[in-house]
Amino acid sequence: MTREIAIGNVKMGGSRPLVLIAGPCVIENETATLRCAERLMTIVNGLSIPLIFKASYDKANRTSVTAFRGPGLKEGLRILAKVKESLGLPVISDIHSIEQVQPAAEVLDILQIPAFLCRQTDLLVEAARTGCVVNVKKGQFLAPWDMENVVGKIVASGNERIILTERGASFGYNNLVSDMRSLPIMRRFGFPVVFDATHSVQLPGGQGGSSGGQREFVEYLSRAAVATGIDGVFLEVHEEPDKALCDGPNSVPLDDLPVLLKKLKAIDAIVK
């Protein structure tokens, strides 16, 4: 069993019910971000599912230099602070450099380490020293057991408020595959484990200048992952994914979310 950690008004891990981490891939603008957060709240309140709101202020590893990256650190954190204060939701976003850590920690409940940066010791240590919860996405290039070394870096820096997230493993060119064995393997380290069901169906760089995705498989993979007894599921959502400025092909339409969450909640209740 994993340890229980508090994230704002949400508790994750141990024998706690499944937690949802959800939101748009990137902050497109303030209005759309707040509207998405409000819709998510309405959905989860009807299902009694704990929610942590996710949106990136900067997508620093987009495929193309011309791709939309977001509003940036200062404006993005202002918008996330507004979501947090107006709706009472814990918030999470990516950090990409040690310079971003302190300002991000003043707003965010969870500092997220992107998969491509999961071995960057200086970034892990700086994030750990804030005392914030640190969510590390397992690199597409890492074996699940290699994440124990990542955990060790954070713990050695005085922080045991850790979440580990599986988001697929590279499988040839422009493709990812989900190995469900990684979930119980990482849970053995004693910290909550989350499955990122939307990035796991991403086709990195699959559209030439941007990534593709296969959102039709999100439900199947998330159901399988929840059946292993994980602590949370991570879903990027959008009102109109085909018009999204980032990761639309693998995002879940908000209109489809209630049905999916009902299924995941039922599976979680059985396995826990």
UniProtKB/Swiss-Prot annotation:
**E.C. number(s) listed in UniProt:** 2.5.1.55
**Is Cytoplasm tagged as a keyword?**
yes
Q: Extract the InterPro entries matched here.
A: Aldolase_TIM (IPR013785), DAHP1/KDSA (IPR006218), KDO8P_synthase (IPR006269)
Disulfide bonding pattern of the chain: none
Protein localization: Cytoplasm
Q: Tell me the Gene Ontology biological-process terms attached to this UniProt entry.
A: keto-3-deoxy-D-manno-octulosonic acid biosynthetic process
Determine if Phosphoprotein is one of this entry's keywords.
no
**Keywords in alphabetical order:** Cytoplasm, Lipopolysaccharide biosynthesis, Transferase
One annotated GO molecular function = 3-deoxy-8-phosphooctulonate synthase activity
Q: Give an example GO cellular component term for this record.
A: cytoplasm
What metabolic or biological pathway is this protein involved in?
Carbohydrate biosynthesis; 3-deoxy-D-manno-octulosonate biosynthesis; 3-deoxy-D-manno-octulosonate from D-ribulose 5-phosphate: step 2/3; Bacterial outer membrane biogenesis; lipopolysaccharide biosynthesis
- Pfam families noted in UniProt: DAHP_synth_1
* Reactions performed catalytically: D-arabinose 5-phosphate + phosphoenolpyruvate + H2O = 3-deoxy-alpha-D-manno-2-octulosonate-8-phosphate + phosphate
Q: Which family does it belong to?
A: Belongs to the KdsA family.
Its name, as the record gives it, is 2-dehydro-3-deoxyphosphooctonate aldolase
